[in-house]
């Protein structure tokens, strides 16, 4: 579950999270990811993820995202708290041009670039973890749109099976 920020830039959420303003727009996402490769003696995995999201509050539409990228697993405290960090990159398709993106950016498109950064923590031998994710849609510096996009901070749960 995430809440959409009114911050213009994703890095504003990372550098000053306590000063972030949020709009009354939320995002609920269900995702399936699959690891397809491991490197560096298992320290890095590569995964692909598909997401179905529903935006509600000040906007109401569905969002479909597909992304792939690396996940880092080698943290020195993993014996106490299993930790991983991921960066995934792909595409995001909204079922309509998001109203909040229009309000915040002046324009947007249904199809935009999608990326996320995630940190997940859980018990050392457990198959579940809690995740904190920055969910980002953007025009990709004019590749898909000159304006548009959004940032959402999301808290979630991951289950391995």
Labelled PLM ranges:
Residues 1-34, 158:
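Short glycine/proline- and aromatic-enriched beta-strand/turn motifs that initiate or cap beta-hairpins
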Residues 27, 34-41, 46-148, 158-161:
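Outer-membrane beta-barrel transmembrane domain signature
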